[in-house]
């Protein structure tokens, strides 16, 4: 068989060379007619001349004395070769204008040419054939046809494609349908019916690749045809609307300063419409951007929803905008099969407010300085401020309160404390500030009961002034009786306040009443020589703790002179 085939090849090459110089209408390589088939499956290929390039069919051409010749060029080769029609079991054969492969092999890939000619006429066209492998899930580099089904709208059928002519109508092949790798059996809304696959009310979940495998018997040999297609569920025609422009809109204003970058997006929604040509474009002052003397950049992008609704965006940008650019009219346009829409962008020059940086800084600094000064003044002179307020706006506590004394003085009965109370405290509080003091040893009558008179004096007083010293805390003294009575009166009735003056430091407080009093009351400390000056902090603290009382007895100068002279002798 090898020798005859070689002789035939040489004869064919001779024919091709003998006609090489003759005129032949060569339609070239028709890449649009590329044919893809699976390995080890039959392929049936018609000569494209009679389908797209010539006005007559094969029967007419044959009866006119024209001969159809087939040859091919192997993949990655340049040499044209005759097709071997003498392979075992007629694996490759020709029937009229059809070239048959039963089945294909990977090395059948190449460019195939069909030539129609006689002694006076010649016409030929080439087309590529690609034999591809498939895996167990029918995945392959093949370009898949797409079937679009309207969402939730009636019953849709798809048919296993490109199987006509492979077997006579008397043969009933078996057909198995798959979605991806899964055979379609008892699916919710998908039902196979032979060559057809029915979708009952399609849903987005039906999106995917569907494969039909057709099996038939020919001349005792079993052949398989595998056809895969993509199903996409798309928006219903009843939901089709004209374009909707998201941006620009009336709510957004593009304010820019000259020299800044201006960026305006034209973002448009298109509902799915079969075979609709969706487009968007900009106009500037009614002209195309290319016709305007402005350096404009336009970038377009497209995204799709699960039902193939489309969102298309064109971003218009001007790197450095000028005042003239900010006065132009920028309009976004959109069009689909349902209608058109347009929306102008609001662009204006930003108004720059006057900058008061120096003034604001000075004002802020002055405010901070004033606050700091006020805090310092209050911290240093708060006693003077309280006394000033009491002197001019305070309410006299002595009016109609039924009290006879302003202060009851409680102290330890020894020479040092008595001298401090009788000379220093009494001298300033009575003579300087005009308060009326109750000093038990001075104001009590002889022969009276000490306990009763002490309680009576305390009840008649507005304040209880306790002079603390180590001798004060000794158990069983009259001073402790006075302290307990004052604290009890303050706690139960609230008509007396206790003032603690520390004459000398007390290290160990064993009296619980005194401990409790020191923990909740402010202690005014006597600091010896430092505290003798009548305008000092000690006397101001003590005066703040005293009852508010109007006493015009002394002028300021008299008070100062008397206090200082009286204290100097203490």
From Swiss-Prot:
Q: Name one GO biological process term.
A: trans-synaptic signaling by trans-synaptic complex
Give the positions the UniProt entry annotates as the active site.
482
How does the record say this protein sits in the membrane?
A: Single-pass type I membrane protein
Show the InterPro entries listed in the entry.
Ig-like_dom, Ig-like_dom_sf, Ig-like_fold, Ig_sub, IL-1_rcpt_fam, IL-1_rcpt_I/II-typ, IL-1RAcP-like_ig, TIR_dom
Q: Which domain of life is it from?
A: Eukaryota
State the top-level EC class. hydrolase
Residue spans with biased composition (Polar residues)? 553-570
Q: Which residues form the TIR domain?
A: 403-546
Alphabetized, the UniProt keywords read: Disulfide bond, Glycoprotein, Hydrolase, Immunoglobulin domain, Inflammatory response, Membrane, NAD, Phosphoprotein, Receptor, Repeat, Signal, Transmembrane, Transmembrane helix
Regions of this protein lying in the Cytoplasmic compartment: 389-570
Region annotated Essential for interaction with PTPRD, chain positions:
69-85
Residue ranges occupied by any Ig-like C2-type domain in the UniProt entry? 21-128, 141-230, 243-348
Give the sites modified to Phosphoserine. Answer: 557
PROSITE patterns registered for this protein in UniProt: IG_LIKE, TIR
Q: What family does the entry list?
A: Belongs to the interleukin-1 receptor family.
**Function of the molecule:** Coreceptor for IL1RL2 in the IL-36 signaling system. Coreceptor with IL1R1 in the IL-1 signaling system. Associates with IL1R1 bound to IL1B to form the high affinity interleukin-1 receptor complex which mediates interleukin-1-dependent activation of NF-kappa-B and other pathways. Signaling involves the recruitment of adapter molecules such as TOLLIP, MYD88, and IRAK1 or IRAK2 via the respective TIR domains of the receptor/coreceptor subunits. Recruits TOLLIP to the signaling complex.
According to the record's subunit comment, the protein's assembly and interactions are: The interleukin-36 receptor complex is a heterodimer of IL1RL2 and IL1RAP; the association is inhibited by IL36RN. The interleukin-1 receptor complex is a heterodimer of IL1R1 and IL1RAP. Associates with IL1R2 to form a non-signaling interleukin-1 receptor complex. Interacts with IL-33-bound IL1RL1 to form the minimal interleukin-33 signaling complex with a 1:1:1 stoichiometry. Interacts with KIT (independently of stimulation with KITLG/SCF). A mast cell-specific KITLG/SCF-induced interleukin-33 signaling complex contains IL1RL1, IL1RAP, KIT and MYD88.
Record's protein name: Interleukin-1 receptor accessory protein
Its source organism is Rattus norvegicus
Gene expressing this chain: Il1rap
């Amino acid at each position: 068989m090898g020798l005859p085939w070689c002789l035939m090849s040489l004869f064919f090459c001779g024919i091709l060379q003998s006609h090489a110089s003759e005129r032949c209408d060569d339609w070239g390589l028709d890449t649009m007619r590329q044919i893809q088939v699976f390995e080890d499956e039959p392929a049936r290929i018609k000569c494209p001349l009679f389908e797209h390039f010539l006005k007559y069919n094969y029967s007419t051409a044959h009866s006119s004395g024209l001969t159809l010749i087939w040859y091919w060029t192997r993949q990655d080769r340049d040499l044209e070769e005759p097709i071997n029609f003498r392979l075992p079991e007629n694996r490759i054969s020709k029937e009229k204008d059809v070239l048959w492969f039963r089945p294909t092999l990977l090395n059948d890939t190449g460019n195939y040419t069909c030539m129609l000619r006689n002694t006076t006429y010649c016409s030929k066209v080439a087309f590529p054939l690609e034999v591809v492998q498939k895996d167990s899930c029918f995945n392959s580099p093949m370009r898949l046809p797409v079937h679009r089904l309207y969402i939730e709208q009636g019953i849709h059928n798809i048919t296993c494609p490109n199987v006509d002519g492979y077997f006579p109508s008397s043969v009933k092949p078996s057909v198995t349908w798959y979605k991806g790798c899964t055979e379609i059996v008892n699916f919710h809304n998908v039902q196979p019916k032979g060559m057809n696959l029915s979708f009952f009310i399609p849903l987005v979940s039906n999106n995917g690749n569907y494969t039909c495998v057709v099996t038939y018997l020919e001349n005792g040999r079993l052949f398989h045809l595998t056809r895969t297609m993509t199903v996409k569920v798309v928006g219903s025609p009843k939901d089709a609307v004209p374009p909707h422009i998201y941006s620009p809109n009336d709510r957004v204003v593009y304010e820019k300063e000259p020299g800044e970058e201006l960026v305006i997006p034209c973002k448009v929604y298109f509902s799915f419409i079969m075979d609709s040509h969706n487009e968007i474009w900009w106009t500037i002052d009614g002209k195309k951007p290319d016709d305007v003397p402005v350096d404009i950049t336009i970038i377009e992008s497209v995204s799709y929803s699960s039902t193939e609704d489309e969102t298309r965006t064109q971003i218009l940008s001007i790197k450095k905008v000028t005042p003239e650019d900010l006065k132009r009219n920028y309009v976004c346009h959109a069009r689909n099969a349902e209608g058109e829409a347009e929306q102008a962008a609001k662009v204006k020059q930003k108004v720059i407010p006057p900058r008061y940086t120096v003034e604001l800084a000075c004002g802020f600094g002055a405010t901070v300085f004033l606050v700091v000064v006020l805090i310092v003044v209050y911290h240093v002179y708060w006693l003077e401020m309280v006394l000033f307020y009491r002197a001019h706006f305070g309410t006299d506590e002595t009016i109609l309160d039924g009290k006879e004394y302003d202060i009851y003085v409680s102290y330890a009965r020894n020479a040092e404390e008595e001298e401090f109370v009788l000379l220093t405290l009494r001298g300033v509080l009575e003579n300087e500030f005009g308060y009326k003091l109750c000093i038990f040893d001075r104001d009590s009558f002889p022969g009276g009961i000490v306990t009763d008179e002490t309680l009576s004096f305390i009840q008649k007083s507005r304040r209880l002034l306790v002079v603390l010293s180590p001798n004060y805390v000794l158990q069983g003294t009259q001073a402790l009786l006075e302290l307990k009575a004052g604290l009890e009166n303050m706690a139960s009735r609230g008509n007396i306040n206790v003032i603690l003056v520390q004459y000398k430091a007390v290290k160990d407080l064993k009296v619980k009443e005194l401990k409790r009093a020191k923990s909740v009351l402010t202690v005014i400390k006597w600091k010896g020589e430092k505290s003798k000056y009548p305008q000092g902090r000690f006397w101001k603290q003590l005066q703040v703790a005293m009852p508010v009382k109007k006493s015009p007895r002394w002028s300021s100068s008299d008070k100062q002179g008397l206090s200082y002279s009286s204290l100097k002798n203490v």
